[in-house]
């Protein structure tokens, strides 16, 4: 087994895991399209029967979850827990409504976006004739593996947090809870993998410019043949065209999925507050499991932040890949057009204009979370001593 993993490259392994994540998203009813392969061309298309099956299934499971959750809230004696659980229930309604709306009304836009991603990966890969096919490198593999760990936790956490014995009723309740929670969390993972993909596209294109095109530009001068100059000119224009297409794809992705990210972040913060309250105030005997659950949600936010930061950094590195372009003024004019585009189209991920997704924001959130948990635990100990 270890020999197999050693022989398998990081890009190929990442591609295999992404294929599993695609099937997982189909299984939980978030993805309603299928992948169709025609020789070297891969496209996605809508399966109408799968879409309406997912819509019906989601309505049924959420209805069951809604009434069971109301019953569990009514028997709780702690007012704070009642409020937090009630907020989670209320917030789950727009999450489910948004998923249903995306399934019914925005399917063609999502299909166009996914096909655009696949087309860009093919075009960037064609620049490297001998490059090993796959997705990214070791950094991307590590982040995808962390996403995979998060998926595994979503499937099993309820089995360890519920103390009652297993039964058919428990299995049904677990499935309804899992179907809702996993679909909400997938918003986080879609944004994480989406911006990770944009970062890979920028990184691969930057690598080609730095290792191939830049050298060709620097060697050219006015004495070069017109055919050679024209060939390099075409490659330069091709790269600039790809930069623009990647940027426009990022805008499409932002418009489609960042509103979903906003809902998922609110839901995630509320869950973290709920779990933190249970850990710091109630002091469950199995609090270690709740600490793992808390760490899982913090990990999800970390993955989104790192993916966004990676894409932003690769975008900012575009201008530094070209260097001196030689003596031909036409190349400098073409690059000036690119640099103007970079200045006008600054790459950033803003959550509805409220804040940008950055490492600084993540660290501030983490600091606030730890301070809040410490305050609640200290208050609990003072009340207990009193």
Swiss-Prot record:
Q: Which residue stretches, if any, does this entry annotate as coiled coil? A: none
Q: Which UniProt keywords apply?
A: Cell membrane, Glycoprotein, Membrane, Receptor, Transducer, Transmembrane, Transmembrane helix
Organism domain of life? Eukaryota
Q: How does it sit in the membrane?
A: Multi-pass membrane protein
What single Pfam family name could you report for this chain, choosing any that match? 7tm_7
Cite the ranges annotated as topological domain Cytoplasmic: 1-14, 101-141, 191-256, 309-356
Compartments in which it is found: Cell membrane
Q: Which residues cross the membrane?
A: 15-35, 80-100, 142-162, 170-190, 257-277, 288-308, 357-377
**What are the glycosylated positions?**
54
What InterPro entries does its record include? 7TM_chemorcpt (IPR013604)
According to its UniProt entry, the protein's GO biological process terms are:
monoatomic ion transmembrane transport; sensory perception of taste; signal transduction
Q: Which residues lie on this side of the membrane: Extracellular?
A: 36-79, 163-169, 278-287, 378-386
The reply on keyword Mitochondrion is no
Q: Please provide, in alphabetical order, the Gene Ontology terms of the cellular component aspect for this entry.
A: membrane; plasma membrane
- GO MF entries: ligand-gated monoatomic ion channel activity; taste receptor activity
Chief localization: membrane
Q: Which family does it belong to?
A: Belongs to the insect chemoreceptor superfamily. Gustatory receptor (GR) family. Gr93a subfamily.
What does this protein do, in the record's words? Probable gustatory receptor which mediates acceptance or avoidance behavior, depending on its substrates.
Q: What is the protein's given name?
A: Putative gustatory receptor 92a
State the species of origin.
Answer: Drosophila melanogaster
Q: Which gene encodes it?
A: Gr92a
């Amino acid at each position: 087994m270890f020999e197999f993993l050693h022989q398998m490259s990081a890009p190929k392994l990442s591609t295999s895991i992404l294929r599993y994540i695609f099937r997982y998203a189909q299984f939980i009813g978030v993805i309603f399209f299928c992948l169709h392969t025609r020789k070297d061309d891969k496209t996605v298309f809508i399966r109408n029967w799968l879409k309406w099956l997912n819509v019906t299934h989601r309505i049924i499971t959420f209805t069951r979850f809604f009434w069971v959750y109301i019953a569990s809230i009514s028997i709780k004696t702690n007012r704070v827990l009642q409020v937090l659980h009630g907020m989670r229930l209320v917030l789950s309604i727009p999450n489910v409504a948004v998923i249903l709306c995306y399934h019914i009304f925005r399917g063609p836009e999502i299909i166009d976006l996914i096909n655009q991603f696949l087309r860009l990966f093919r075009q960037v890969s064609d620049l490297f004739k001998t490059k090993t096919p796959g997705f990214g490198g070791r950094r991307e593999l590590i982040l995808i593996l962390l996403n995979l760990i998060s998926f595994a936790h979503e499937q099993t956490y309820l089995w360890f947090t519920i103390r009652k014995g297993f039964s058919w009723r428990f299995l049904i309740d677990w499935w309804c809870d899992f179907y809702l929670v996993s679909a909400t969390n997938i918003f986080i993972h879609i944004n994480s993998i989406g911006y990770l993909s944009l970062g890979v596209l920028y990184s691969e294109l930057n690598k080609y410019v730095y290792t191939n095109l830049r050298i060709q530009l620097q060697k050219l001068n006015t004495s070069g043949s017109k055919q050679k100059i024209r060939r390099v000119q075409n490659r330069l224009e091709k790269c600039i065209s790809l930069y623009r297409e990647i940027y426009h794809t990022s805008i499409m992705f932002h418009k489609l999925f960042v509103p979903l990210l906003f809902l998922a972040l609110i839901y995630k913060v509320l869950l973290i507050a709920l779990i933190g309250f249970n850990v710091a105030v109630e002091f469950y005997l199995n609090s270690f499991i709740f600490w793992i659950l808390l760490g899982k949600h913090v990990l999800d936010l970390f993955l989104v932040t790192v993916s966004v930061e990676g894409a932003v950094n690769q975008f900012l590195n575009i201008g530094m890949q070209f260097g001196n372009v030689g003596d031909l003024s036409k190349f400098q004019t073409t690059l000036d057009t690119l640099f103007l585009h970079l200045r006008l189209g600054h790459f950033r991920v803003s959550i509805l204009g409220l804040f940008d997704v950055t490492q600084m924001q993540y660290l501030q959130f983490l600091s606030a979370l730890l301070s809040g948990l410490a305050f609640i635990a200290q208050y609990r100990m003072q009340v207990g001593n009193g």
